[in-house]
Amino acid sequence: MNVERSELLAGIGQDALWALIEGRHGDPFSILGPHQSGGMTIVRVYLPGAEAVDLIDATSGRVVAPFSIAHPSGLFAATVASRTGYRLRITWPDAVQITEDPYSFGLLLGELDLHLISEGTHYSLSRTLGAVAMSIDGISGVRFAVWAPNARRVSVVGDFNAWDGRRNPMRLRPSAGVWELFIPRLAPGERYKFEIVDAEGTCLPQKADPVARASEAAPSTASIVASSTPFRWTDDGWMKGRSRQDRLEGAFSVYEVHVGSWLRDQKDGNRSLDWVELSQRLVPYVSDMGFTHIELLPIMEHPFGGSWGYQPLGLFAPTGRYGTPEDFAYFVDRCHGAGLGVILDWVPAHFPTDVWGLARFDGSALYEHEDPREGFHRDWNTLIYNLGRNEVKGFLIASALEWLERYHIDGLRVDAVASMLYRDYSRNEGEWIPNQYGGRENLEAVEFFKHLNSIIHERCPHAMTIAEESTAWPGVTKPPEQGGLGFDIKWNMGWMHDSLSYIEKDPIYRSYAHGTMTFGMIYAYSERFILPISHDEVVYGKGSLLTKMPGDEWQKFANLRSYLAFMWGHPGKKLLFMGSEIAQPSEWNHDGSVTWDVLDQPQHVGIQRLVKDLNGLYGDEPALQFGDFHSEGFEWAAADDAVNSVLGMLRYAPDRASSVLVMSNFTPVPRYGYRIGVPSDGVWIERITTDAREYGGSGLVNGAVSSEPVPAHGRPVSLSLTLPPLSTIFLQGPSP
């Protein structure tokens, strides 16, 4: 090596030089960029594949100094008299590139940001980590940052550097284990990943950005630099008017949707609709049907479509399958414009093992537990988040807030809560590790949920959290300060299983299972419940709701009408999966579409009209809302008539300002002159009967029924009703 080349490499040891060349150097700024040496400034760049490099004046563009080859692998260096503003003119075999030097910029992240990341309390994580399009000193570009504390070297790679991890190694901020680099002249839309060398020197498969706000559509896996331009929302009225308390007290009827299979364009390769098309088709449909909310199965970026989104890897990015993040924001904006709230299914329980994802992200068990007895979920072959690690808790909470704050989401339904609460969930003896007290409770998960809900309700007081929790864990919807987990609503899985097992029976045998339909009221007010007839009940060979019903075709439809109306009359908020509102004959297929063509048949139209009318009555009548969460809003009118398989419920508005009687006859035998005691003397008006001809029924109706001074069911007055076969009826009580 000649003297001139030695001067260009002054202060750089052979080990450091070879570490840079081989892509193992953890401190590239110690070699690259401008450095003072003997009163001069040496600028070094490492650009494998470049033919020549010139240092040019940032203002005039004139060549200040050509770079010399400091090492044939692609290390160039130039010496200048002063450290003034400069740019690089790089000659590649097929192009000339002019850019600022990424290694001329100082520290990027503030110490407070780093402290909050380590503490797990940086709740605006996507504004710090990930790829942020921004300007520094008037120079536009993208700041990249990623948490990888156990890595030896991290580089950002993309089309902009031919996916060569040697070109853009990042700077480590050791206090937080975060790596950072600003690359000038990059813009939103660039594809990128991180290339990581682990502590043992092994170069890992290139990793997608855990905090990316946009990603390629599957099966491609690169992250995409998202726009930093805020979306122009038009939902100010909705945002100012929404109230979590109002939603909890009022009508709450949810239409659950798998975006990719709600409707497909058969004229265009059977493709799923995108967000803009869904805004034009799905939003007006759900609004017209009278639902108050749309709940979307997970739309966070996920590699495997067959997981329905429940195995996500991009917890900050709407999946690229249906459009851009801006398209998704537009969809939410249109929902709000139509008076619909938006709930997202959100999955903090586990993540898939794809090598380009979070699994052993920096060569260590970073996001997951090291021990598979804590870190591997056998049911789903997925990895479990380590909630005992501050950075992981902060990552998850920041993800939740991202959807609520950036995308104006109205609520999160948290998936698989039970799997997080129990250390022995779906594990045999010896396959799990007890907590510090020897118990099965996952204390880290308990504290996580308490903190998650507290932070959400503090920062987004309008937002709701809903737990899919399938056990009897106490206090799921109690505030954390009262020892609860802090959710607003819990799925009532018990009611769902009991009621479906009952309605699937032949009516001959229902009298023996009568208690399964009344049992739910024993615990109905122990939590704030929603009654879920979800996607899980119409898949994996379970059949559709319609095919669950016993009997011939007429009886199947009658059973379904009666069941749905019973659900709407029963205390608890409502959730119905797409397709069930039209009595879809086949079970759900995520690769297909709702079978909308059945609406050519009147019996399916009848079910659809019934659901719309049930939503309308639910929304109009406070008596059907108040008792959802308040025991004083409900009484059994008839709970013990197992012989006739008849159930009667009385629903009351606050202060009993209004009342509704709900009667169900779950046999194919009409009941004439059925006497039922009522609390109010006067005329009771039939608002809905599922046996109405417009719903596909036989047309047995009650109309207006006057009470009679005949005691029944412990009440001094009663009604003599006609209960049509396999039906549910709603009667409005007289004004007090």
UniProtKB/Swiss-Prot annotation:
Cellular component GO terms, alphabetical: cytosol
Gene Ontology molecular function terms on file: 1,4-alpha-glucan branching enzyme activity; cation binding; hydrolase activity, hydrolyzing O-glycosyl compounds
Superkingdom per UniProt: Bacteria
Reactions accelerated catalytically: Transfers a segment of a (1->4)-alpha-D-glucan chain to a primary hydroxy group in a similar glucan chain
SUPFAM superfamilies: (Trans)glycosidases, E set domains, Glycosyl hydrolase domain
UniProt KW keywords: Carbohydrate metabolism, Glycogen biosynthesis, Glycogen metabolism, Glycosyltransferase, Plasmid, Transferase
UniProt-listed GO biological process terms: glycogen biosynthetic process
Coiled-coil regions listed in the entry: none
Active site: 415 (nucleophile), 468 (proton donor)
Entry's EC annotation: 2.4.1.18
Pathway membership, UniProt: Glycan biosynthesis; glycogen biosynthesis
Family annotation (HAMAP family): GlgB (MF_00685)
Record-stated family: Belongs to the glycosyl hydrolase 13 family. GlgB subfamily.
Functional summary from the UniProt entry: Catalyzes the formation of the alpha-1,6-glucosidic linkages in glycogen by scission of a 1,4-alpha-linked oligosaccharide from growing alpha-1,4-glucan chains and the subsequent attachment of the oligosaccharide to the alpha-1,6 position.
Subunit (UniProt): Monomer.
Protein name: 1,4-alpha-glucan branching enzyme GlgB 2
Organism of provenance: Rhizobium johnstonii (strain DSM 114642 / LMG 32736 / 3841)
